[in-house]
């Protein structure tokens, strides 16, 4: 679907380092996320997708945040705070998502963690 830019809120245009995740999904798809690697000036998301926009535009932080949010511990925690919405869907409210605590080591440590995880994925 194409809309004139004047009809699109600037805050929903995808930017480099944004993370996107479904707001309403099946339980097994909770925390399925993607990181936006470059500005996408003509791309937005729909109403059932969250944009998680890190306060820092640093790629190291964005990659670390994605890895942390997809870790088994945080996935299980986020699953535990979702609401069932209908027969088969779960809803992650912004208010509940905002309560998730994520450990944030210094940026140099985040880089080391990112590198180790990337090396492990290359071995798969």
Positions of PLM-derived features:
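Short, ligand-facing micro-motifs at secondary-structure edges
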Residues: 1, 19-46, 63, 67, ...
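Sequence-specific dsDNA recognition surfaces
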Residues: 1-19
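Alpha-helix N-cap/helix-initiation motif
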Residues: 3-6, 58, 67
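A short glycine-rich beta-alpha junction/loop motif
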Residues: 42-50, 84-105
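Extended, Lys/Arg-rich, non-catalytic nucleic-acid recognition/anchoring regions
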Residues: 54
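Short, conserved charged micro-motifs
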Residues: 58-63, 111
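Amphipathic alpha-helical coiled-coil/heptad-repeat segments
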Residues: 71, 75-76, 96-124
């Amino acid at each position: 679907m194409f809309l004139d830019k004047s009809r699109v809120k600037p805050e929903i245009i995808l930017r480099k380092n944004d993370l996107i995740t479904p707001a309403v999904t099946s339980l097994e798809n909770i925390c399925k996320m993607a990181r936006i690697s470059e500005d996408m000036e003509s791309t937005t998301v729909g109403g059932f997708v969250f944009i998680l926009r890190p306060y820092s535009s640093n790629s190291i932080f964005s990659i670390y945040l994605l890895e942390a949010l997809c870790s088994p511990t945080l996935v299980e925690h986020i699953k535990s705070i979702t609401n069932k919405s209908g027969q088969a869907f779960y809803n992650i409210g912004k208010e509940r998502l905002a309560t998730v605590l994520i450990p944030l080591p210094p940026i140099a440590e985040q880089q080391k963690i990112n590198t180790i995880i990337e090396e492990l994925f290359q071995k798969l």
